[in-house]
Amino acid sequence: MASREDELRNCVVCGDQATGYHFNALTCEGCKGFFRRTVSKSIGPTCPFAGSCEVSKTQRRHCPACRLQKCLDAGMRKDMILSAEALALRRAKQAQRRAQQTPVQLSKEQEELIRTLLGAHTRHMGTMFEQFVQFRPPAHLFIHHQPLPTLAPVLPLVTHFADINTFMVLQVIKFTKDLPVFRSLPIEDQISLLKGAAVEICHIVLNTTFCLQTQNFLCGPLRYTIEDGARVGFQVEFLELLFHFHGTLRKLQLQEPEYVLLAAMALFSPDRPGVTQRDEIDQLQEEMALTLQSYIKGQQRRPRDRFLYAKLLGLLAELRSINEAYGYQIQHIQGLSAMMPLLQEICS
C-alpha cells in the first residue's frame, strides 16, 4: 500500500514517478511532454467513450483526450508553454551557461608556453624589485625611514630613479632573450620589439608591487609615491594617468601566469616600427592571446570577471599611450636622459 509521502512524489495525472513541477503541476516526464505536444496542436483529441477512460501509468496512452483533460484538471496551464522559438532560445542560453561553467582545459602546448614564460620571469624578474635597495636610495624612500647601512654615499632621487629604470630594462632584455620564440626572430625584429615593449613590460610587472590601499609601489623596503615621480620631474598629469592605470590593473587581481602572458602580448606586437616579419609576430601574439583567454576561462572566476580578457585588451591599448607619453617625459626632464642612455635609446 502506497504511503502518503509516495503519493506526493507521484504524477498527479497518471501516478508514475514525478520529476518536478511542470506547467504548474507535479508530473512525470511523460505527461509533461504529452501536454506540451498536445496543446500545441490546432485540433485537440476527442474521446470515443464520453470522457470516462482510465488514465494510469499503464493506460495513459489509450485515450489522449481523457489524459489531456486530466492534465487540465490537475492544474497544468497552457499559457506556461514556451513557443518553439522561446524554447530554443532558453536551451541555447542553458548550453551557454554550462559552457561557461565548464573549465577550459589548456592544451599541452599552452601549458608549456606558460611554463616557459614563468621560468624566464622567475629567473630574471622574480626578485627584481627587492634589488632596488642596492641602488643607494634616498632615506625618505624607506618604508620605516631606516636606510640599510651602506659604505657608498646616498645619491639624489633622480639618479636613483635613472639607475632602477636602467636595471629594470636590462632585466626585461634578459627575460626576452630567455624565450626561444623570441630568439628565433631576426635580430632586427628583436631590437624593434624590445624598443617598443620594454617600458610596457616594466609597468606590467611593476604592477605586482602596487598597493591599492596606499596608492604606492612597495619594492622590498622601499616605497615610491606619486610625489616622488613629481620630484624627479614628471608632469603631474602624466603621473595621475600612470597611477590610475596601475590601480585599474591591480584591481583585476591577476595571477602570475596572466601577468606574464599579458607581458608576452605586449612584446609580440606586430605593428611596432621597424618590424619586418609581421605575419610571424602576429601569429605569436595570437598564440599568447589565445593562451591567456583559455587560462582565464579555466579559472572559474566570479561572474563579474567574465569580461576580464576584454578589460586587459583595453588596458594594453592604454599602456601603449602611456609608453609614448613616458618617452616624451624622459626626453624633456633636464639631465635625466643623459643618465639613462639605454632607456633613451629605447624611447627614441
Curated annotation (Swiss-Prot):
GO cellular component: chromatin; cytoplasm; cytoskeleton; nucleoplasm; nucleus
Zinc finger NR C4-type: from-to: 11-31, 47-71
UniProt record, GO biological process: regulation of transcription by RNA polymerase II
Alphabetical UniProt keywords: Activator, Cytoplasm, Cytoskeleton, DNA-binding, Metal-binding, Nucleus, Phosphoprotein, Receptor, Transcription, Transcription regulation, Zinc, Zinc-finger
Compartment annotation: Nucleus; Cytoplasm; Cytoplasm, Cytoskeleton
Domain NR LBD: from-to ranges: 109-348
Keyword RNA-binding: no
Modification note: Phosphorylated at Thr-38 by PKC, dephosphorylation of Thr-38 is required for nuclear translocation and activation.
One term of GO molecular function: zinc ion binding
Phosphothreonine: residues carrying this PTM: T38
DNA-binding region per Swiss-Prot/TrEMBL record: 8-83
Cross-referenced InterPro entries: NHR-like_dom_sf, Nucl_hrmn_rcpt_lig-bd, Nuclear_hormone_rcpt_NR1, Nuclear_hrmn_rcpt, ThyrH_rcpt, Znf_hrmn_rcpt, Znf_NHR/GATA
Any matching Pfam family: Hormone_recep
Quaternary structure note: Heterodimer of NR1I3 and RXR. Interacts with PSMC4. Interacts with ECT2. Directly interacts with DNAJC7; this complex may also include HSP90. Interacts with CRY1. Interacts with CRY2 in a ligand-dependent manner.
Comment text on domains: Composed by a short N-terminal domain followed by the DNA binding, hinge, and ligand binding/dimerization domains.
Family: Belongs to the nuclear hormone receptor family. NR1 subfamily.
Role, per record: Binds and transactivates the retinoic acid response elements that control expression of the retinoic acid receptor beta 2 and alcohol dehydrogenase 3 genes. Transactivates both the phenobarbital responsive element module of the human CYP2B6 gene and the CYP3A4 xenobiotic response element.
Record-given protein name: Nuclear receptor subfamily 1 group I member 3
Protein's organism: Pan troglodytes (Chimpanzee)
Classification lineage: Eukaryota, Metazoa, Chordata, Craniata, Vertebrata
